[in-house]
Swiss-Prot record:
It catalyses: an N-acyl-L-alpha-aminoacyl-tRNA + H2O = an N-acyl-L-amino acid + a tRNA + H(+). It is found in: Cytoplasm. One of its GO terms (molecular function) is peptidyl-tRNA hydrolase activity. HAMAP family: Pept_tRNA_hydro_arch (MF_00628). One of its GO terms (cellular component) is cytosol. This is Peptidyl-tRNA hydrolase. One of its GO terms (biological process) is translation. Its EC number is 3.1.1.29. It comes from Methanopyrus kandleri (strain AV19 / DSM 6324 / JCM 9639 / NBRC 100938).
Length: 116
């Protein structure tokens, strides 16, 4: 089974619309990286494009997760906001990882809680 995970910073106070847009940026960005890298995109598409949104504590943890994903060879995309609405330009908001095999992504994000 394959999935994509989006990790959102828990310390940012974002409106629902802003959060939805940032998650969409992370999902699409990670998908495009995966497609370029030869990751199993077609399998993920056939299986229904499973996506899971998780929460981390802060920017530092998000950056650590990004580095770990890169070290493990997982396609990933770090979102930096343009600063046109709610946030300062360059604010790191979330991270998209995958699509890739669930067990590979879980090695990076398996301890994180769901975003609720």
């Amino acid at each position: 089974m394959y999935k994509q995970v989006i990790v959102v910073r828990g310390d940012l106070k974002l409106s629902r619309g802003k959060l939805a847009a940032q998650v969409a940026h992370a999902s699409l960005g990670a998908f495009l990286r995966a497609k370029e890298s030869g990751a199993p995109v077609e399998e993920w598409l056939r299986e229904g494009q499973k996506k899971v949104v998780l929460k981390c504590k802060d920017k530092e943890e998000l950056l650590e997760l990004h580095e770990l994903a890169k070290r493990r060879g997982l396609p990933s995309f770090l979102v930096r906001d343009a600063g046109l609405t709610e946030l300062e330009p360059g604010t790191v908001t979330c991270l998209g990882i995958g699509p890739e095999r669930e067990e590979e992504i879980d090695r990076v994000t398996g301890d994180l809680p769901l975003l609720r």
